[in-house]
Amino acid sequence: MLIHPQFDPIAFSVGPLSVRWYGLMYLIAFLLFMTLGRVHARRRPELGWNAQQLDDLLLYGMLGVVLGGRLGEVLFFQPAYYFSHPAEILAIWKGGMSFHGGFLGVLVAMWLYGRRSGKGFWQVTDFIAPLVPTGLAAGRLGNFINGELWGRPVQTDVPWAMVYPWVDALPRHPSQLYQVAGEGLLLFAILWVYSARPRPLKAVSAMFLIGYGVLRFAAEFFRTPDPGIFGTLSLGLSTAQWLCVPMIAVGVGLLASTRTDPAH
């Protein structure tokens, strides 16, 4: 059995400036996005992306992630708390970002970017889909370092079970690390390989929706459910699981619709 290290929330300080782990993880995520985006553009030059377009895409994506992720946390998971403490809504350095809200925010941002750049919406989402899991991995690692979003108590004796002393003395699943491995590394590997070859328009986006939806749905069985708009558990499923259901359905529908389309 392991004990959570209880990291200092401050990663490092430079003079009066303190950098929190959560903010550092976001910086790492954006750097990974830019680096891998350039690699992806070079290996698939026929997609027609240049460095300036990638810089603009990052700016739009960053705004979509931060604004959408925070609003999603407020509206989907903790509306009562944030409506009672409205000043906390802007305190993103303390953590509390919803993937599903960030996902919707990115969709809006990519639509706006597509209109500005002249690229089609699906052309944009197909390009960024393989890059997103690295950001998810960095975010979940930040959750683990912050000691938040811990797992459910283990039902069997497993050597990697972890005690979070500020919660209770029960050994729990380190579900944040499960999500780093699943929604982060595994999903990245699948999409990176899948997108290396020409695919029909929308196919890579569809694979992301299916892959993320399935992996997040599974991870929720090991994670302590967040309170949310559907209640902590509704019909045996968490709010995040309910939000994954339409993602998977849309992904399957999109993928099916591309079966006879030409690869690009």
Curated annotation (Swiss-Prot):
Q: Which UniProt keywords apply?
A: Cell inner membrane, Cell membrane, Membrane, Transferase, Transmembrane, Transmembrane helix
Keyword Translocase in record: no
Question: Sorted alphabetically, which HAMAP family does this protein's record hold?
Answer: Lgt
Family the entry assigns: Belongs to the Lgt family.
How is it placed in the membrane, per its record?
A: Multi-pass membrane protein
Listed name of the protein:
Phosphatidylglycerol--prolipoprotein diacylglyceryl transferase
Concerning InterPro entries, the annotation shows: Lgt
Q: Which organism is it from?
A: Aromatoleum aromaticum (strain DSM 19018 / LMG 30748 / EbN1) (Azoarcus sp. (strain EbN1))
A single Gene Ontology CC annotation of this entry is:
plasma membrane
Molecular function terms, GO-annotated: phosphatidylglycerol-prolipoprotein diacylglyceryl transferase activity
Q: What EC number(s) is this enzyme filed under?
A: 2.5.1.145
Q: What does this protein do?
A: Catalyzes the transfer of the diacylglyceryl group from phosphatidylglycerol to the sulfhydryl group of the N-terminal cysteine of a prolipoprotein, the first step in the formation of mature lipoproteins.
Its UniProt pathway annotation is: Protein modification; lipoprotein biosynthesis (diacylglyceryl transfer)
Q: Please list the residues that bind a 1,2-diacyl-sn-glycero-3-phospho-(1'-sn-glycerol).
A: R140
Question: Where is this chain's protein located in or outside the cell?
Answer: Cell inner membrane
Q: Which spans are transmembrane here?
A: 14-34, 57-77, 89-109, 127-147, 176-196, 202-222, 235-255
Enzyme class comes to transferase
> GO biological process: any one?
lipoprotein biosynthetic process
User: What's the encoding gene here?
Assistant: lgt
